[in-house]
């Protein structure tokens, strides 16, 4: 791309409304199969440079949906909708192209409960500290 076309792109993006930007974000996430989340590893790596300090236990956790057997998909879909509040279409998308993060920045007890619900529905799920 030329500098002029990049400037035109920046100008176009600058004129978008918040709703249009949210729609653009969703389209890019779907197209590239990524999520727009801030990288947490950089913060953790910077804290580890400090030296002898013992690593603190995480207070925030992410729940990861790893696998959904075909015969359990409907039950898992219901649980995903229940724990996330997503609409049917978004919940269905979340159960495809796994692994996917179902919940982020949640407490340990909430993460454990969510994983248990997903596993009871037949999914393979886990949680990890952020």
Curated annotation (Swiss-Prot):
InterPro entries: Ribosomal_bL12 (IPR000206), Ribosomal_bL12_C (IPR013823), Ribosomal_bL12_C/ClpS-like (IPR014719), Ribosomal_bL12_oligo (IPR008932), Ribosomal_bL12_oligo_N_sf (IPR036235). Belongs to the bacterial ribosomal protein bL12 family. GO terms for molecular function: mRNA binding; structural constituent of ribosome. Disulfide bonds: none annotated. Residues 94-114 are annotated as: Disordered. Keywords: Ribonucleoprotein, Ribosomal protein. One of its GO terms (cellular component) is cytosolic large ribosomal subunit. This is Large ribosomal subunit protein bL12. Homodimer. Part of the ribosomal stalk of the 50S ribosomal subunit. Forms a multimeric L10(L12)X complex, where L10 forms an elongated spine to which 2 to 4 L12 dimers bind in a sequential fashion. Binds GTP-bound translation factors.
């Amino acid at each position: 791309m030329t500098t002029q076309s990049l400037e035109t792109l920046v100008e176009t993006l600058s004129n978008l409304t918040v709703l249009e930007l949210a729609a653009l974000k969703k389209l890019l996430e779907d197209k590239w199969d990524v999520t727009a989340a801030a990288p947490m590893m950089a913060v953790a790596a910077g804290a580890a440079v400090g030296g002898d300090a013992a690593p603190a236990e995480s207070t925030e956790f992410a729940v990861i949906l790893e696998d959904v057997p075909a015969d359990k998909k409907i039950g898992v879909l219901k649980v995903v909708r229940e724990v996330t509040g997503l609409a049917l279409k978004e919940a269905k998308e979340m159960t495809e192209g796994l692994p996917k993060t179902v919940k982020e920045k949640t407490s340990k007890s909430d993460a454990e409960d969510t994983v248990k619900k997903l596993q009871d529905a037949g999914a393979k799920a886990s949680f990890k500290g952020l």
